[in-house]
């Protein structure tokens, strides 16, 4: 207590404050001059200040305090320092008991009952800052002058006047005095400074002069009014301009009138300069306006009130929420009551009590944070002060409330509240001192309905400080917080349409002295958000249910999908064992397609399994190198195809025996190797794949895993919100380590991550192997018993045993020491492996790196992408690796290749694992289960079978094993150079270097380990292996089973005719290259297999000439839509092709897309391996065709070769002009009719040998008697069959005919058999189009056909060009045709059946046209084929040479055959009859048409050396169907046929371009359309389709229809379609394009039709629907293009040829082709025919 005595005598004011009771208990003598000590106590209501002081921190605070002195009371601003002190209990008692201590509290307080330390706060006045109020204000304000005290007051004032003006005054305060009796004025020096003038003390001024000098004349009337009103004081504010500097100053004049003897004696006054205060007020008012505007603009509703319950702020958003309005006339207190009635709980249907409303809770000191409440707007409330607002919520720049009423800017003193316990209505009488020093008594009644606590009442303590009585009051009106609503346990109620769900946030507003001056609440409308959350929640739940159902569906459907696929593959495999050779190819295609589908199903099911956390791990012992052996066996053929050099390197220190799920490891490696092969570039000379397996230390493994571990979800472009991560223990445990998981179905406390599985706790102690004991000697003795039982326990508990491991602790229990020991031993029992697969493929662009592991992501996802797939492979790999506790990453650069790395920790076992049943077979076939690549004694050596040019490579690598001196790492190298392999027949005949000696030297481990005949067995058996389909067509197209051999050119081998019958004979010819494992490695057998299609060139002279058609004539007026080609597509086409021709002006370019002339489509006839001994049946209503090979004959002057362009296969083959071609492959499938071809030497005018093209000849189906050409080895068997037979079968190729010595004799240019049987001869008339420039922009319109006036008499055929001998030959030919055709009389016609003709339009390639010069193309003479001598008779129609009118059925056939002459002399045709009708232009040809007649025999005949072939090759035969005169593409049985019926009996094959990249689909579509007689051309991508289209336009042989696949490499189907439509828009015409695609989702059809296609057929293809669509589209454009003008012209042509009608068959074979001018009228049949034609 001694220091208290010392503090009491200090001049500084010091107080002592009890921190626990929060009362001021003591003060020294210096503090007695300060009156408002309650302002000090109010600071201790701040809990933060109390805590800081309690913790020993010193605080400095600014406090406004009133000081009482002899001059009165002065309001000062002081700085007080707060610090904590500790007082013992004894001192505290002495403090409270000592009456001499200046205690500020009552001593009867029970402070002695407090337990613990006494902590007091010492408050020390540090510094006085400045005066706040004038020293006279308080005295004037509180001084009352009564008439009874005038004398005494007068004396006091007189006694104090002496030193009044000499004492110092504040700088902003001045005083003045007016002696009324003497009329003199005095003022202080500070007063003059405020006014801005100098004080003249010597000069006496009266009052008028004084106020005039100062410029305050306004004060005089105020004083006069005050005197007259008997008032004692006055106050008046002034705004003046200071005299010396003209500054605006705000002053306030205050005065007091002193009377003496009821007379005014003096007027005392002060002048207060409050300019700084006024400026602060102005600034505050500006800020207040800014705040008002800001609050009004907020979207959230703001509700604020002061401590008296008056509403201060209510912005526009809040008004809309509550349905109320605030204006100047609104009673704010009543408005607040209305606001409180709008709230209700979101969990109940009743309104909140006022105590629970946010504004009341905030006013009571509670912090409101996002409380959900429902606001029900006030309705039907018509009051003068309140109005309902139903306007929509909007932001408004408005300032709310009365501007003059700013409650927040005032200082309120503490309110004394009297609480009535029986009533909640409290009357609060507050005495407040405002800044204007007005005595205002504010009586406020605050109505509340809240449950309140009784507030503490501060006792008024009378203290002797300056003799004054201090009334200390403490405000204590505290409102208790309402009960908290347990939101989590309640269910939200429904929100009505007229209600709002809001989030309320608010708090109280506290003044500087700690008083609560108000509160505010912000209301955020979340109604829409909540509704959207409900919708989203329902949608999420629905999606989760759908996802669950999807997973269950896929899990259940897996059996239903895999079972039929297994049946399909199995049954087809059984069929392969017994099927004939011609069906095996198609069955193999079925197997390959089924396996592709099966692989896709497995991928989808695996991904679904990983997604649904139902992955089952099936561990078993396996050998690592055997795993790679099996993978190399699967991918070997594809490696050969893509010409990849594969290098496999494995660390020799890595053991071979492991325990885990081998199938999952193979799945990961298979996906990565498959991608490396798929995206490799075969044209790259450095095309290679490198596979490296390394062993990592634990630290390296951990470093890789921490660096590349996926810590977040993969990027997803469209489904980023989906989380498909495995629910495993992926969190960081023990430095991001965790054990590899067991089966997913284990319990949750056992971590399902890590290598493959984790041991149970009971297995933890049993898993100590020998390596563990060696590395941990301290545990050796303790674990001997466990080691003895470890093998049995770990083997029996396979599902719970460790497979792959991640070097961390897993789940389970057990002690700490045992667990630490388990972790150490597990790390030692696992091997950390790093796998790297490096390729030199296309790489991954940098911007796609983040998405490469996303599901369904593809680097190129466009329709024109080269590689297929669904984009699940890498995603499955990533999920599997992460599921097993590993990590995967990659390094890639565009066009430089990619390297994929992944790490796994795999359980290593010492004991040799038992052999899998799948590895016990010893069969050497690749189809067996024997390892393809045998492992040597060294674990790191793996070998492959010996193949030509396949080398083994040593990969040297520094070994990381300590103490291991073997630094050589032997790896395998699969160097695929099959592109250099070629089989050369001449080499086989002349080079007898094939050595079967068993004593040859080995040239390496590859040769030594290859079994006998392994080369053939290996290659031939690849057809049956489960390999994925390659993008190349060569492997699947080889009929001999030699996948990879696409071309067999055997030029000098005469004894290979039986090779096709027995493919195994090729081994006898080639020889045993291995020689029972002792074959000389340096032996060169001269055998090479060419697997490259890039170097194949079409020989000179082989042209793919196409016939014309009357279909798909381009029409300008029928093109309804203009398909504009996008600029990016044009740029792509320009980058692919070379410029040629003009382009549409709409595109802004001057050149058409590039169309380099493609190679003639088709497959070579010299495709060795099979003979033509298969039966080909003719479809109903059609003509059977066979495609015999071109035989080599020693008697012929030169061999012949074919172009092999049948069915539009795009791969051509090499052939030499002087070599014979062995034809052994059918041009069509086994169930498809193949055209019969006859080839002979083609000699031009210069007697130069040229290669010829096969001629496809139709075999005429006879309606009554048909010739069964079933065995050409015995021609005597050619006898007519029964009348019901409609098919002709060709059972043997012409090569066998020659070998067996059979021959066909040509009698009168007609073939007959040795026994005199005649062969059916069908004359084939074709229109040849000369190449000529376009006549107009749209040169394909039917209106541009030649009229009869355009033909001169010289262009007509003259009878003189046929000699009598030739006419006689023609008559004999017609007679033979009659005998063979039997009763082939046409319906509704009296004409002879021998007059049937079949029209076929064709075109000769420009190159062939140049070779023939004026013989075929530029000549209008009749060209006769002396070899074939065929007259094609269709329904008794005799075609005149120049009258090629489709509607003229009665024209005489005035053609004769010239022997040994190929062209007619133009001079001999001068006597032609001018009345003949002109030929009709073909819609697929240009305007300059030349007519030629070619006869094609129905069976094969020996080649004639002296004949010249001028007829081009036809891909498919014409079809005979029906006799209707209408255009019809349906045969008599209602099925679609590939020809158009003309003149009731003539059919023209339709040319169809098929754009398809899939080989299997190419074969299917080709077979389907060829069966119906369509002429097919196959394009393997969009660019080639565009090339073929452009080539057809250049040759004026347009396609009738295009079947366009959508997704194709280089150019997609949509891009090719857009380019074709752009060309048509520029040049005219329109060709039907039918989309044939597997894209069958909603919207695909509309998108395709919008791009320019005419129709749409989905895959799998429905043949009936495909025929119907083709028929509809072709007929549609035929009807549009064949305008009425053409029909009228044909009608006139028929009328002009009425005189040429011949009713007798004798006129058909007339020797002189003269016009018969018979006067007979057209018979009834002709009239009916004309009527039918007119109806078209």
From Swiss-Prot:
Listed SMART domains: HATPase_c, HisKA, REC
UniProt KW ATP-binding keyword: yes
Protein's name according to its UniProt entry: Hybrid signal transduction histidine kinase I
Annotated InterPro entries: CheY-like_superfamily, HATPase_C_sf, His_kinase_dom, HisK_dim/P_dom, HisK_dim/P_sf, PAS-assoc_C, PAS-like_dom_sf, Sig_transdc_His_kin-like_C
Function: Acts as a receptor histidine kinase for a signal transduction pathway. This protein undergoes an ATP-dependent autophosphorylation at a conserved histidine residue in the kinase core, and a phosphoryl group is then transferred to a conserved aspartate residue in the receiver domain.
Domain PAS, first and last residues per copy: 287-358
Catalytic activity: ATP + protein L-histidine = ADP + protein N-phospho-L-histidine
Region Disordered, annotated ranges: 143-171, 378-469, 711-821, 952-971, 1080-1124, 1157-1258, 1277-1301, 1330-1393, 1419-1520, 1695-1736
Matching Pfam families: HATPase_c, HisKA, Response_reg
Entry EC no(s): 2.7.13.3
Ranges of Polar residues composition bias in the record: 392-412, 1097-1117, 1330-1339
Domain Response regulatory: 1551-1674
Coiled coil (UniProt feature): none
Record domain PAC: where: 234-286
Any one GO molecular-function label of the UniProt entry: phosphorelay sensor kinase activity
Post-translational modification (record): Activation probably requires transfer of a phosphate group between a histidine in the kinase core (transmitter) domain and an aspartate of the receiver domain.
Gene from which this protein is expressed: dhkI-1
Residues annotated with 4-aspartylphosphate modification: 1605
Residues bearing the modification Phosphohistidine: 559
Domain of life: Eukaryota
Cystine bridges: none
Biased composition (Low complexity): 143-161, 379-389, 413-469, 790-807, 961-971, 1080-1096, 1186-1195, 1202-1258, 1340-1376, 1425-1475, 1482-1492, 1506-1520, 1695-1722
Composition skew (Acidic residues), residue ranges: 725-735, 758-789
One record GO biological process: sorocarp development
The keyword Cell division appears for this protein: no
Keywords carried by this UniProt record: ATP-binding, Kinase, Nucleotide-binding, Phosphoprotein, Transducer, Transferase, Two-component regulatory system
Taxon lineage: Eukaryota, Amoebozoa, Evosea, Eumycetozoa, Dictyostelia
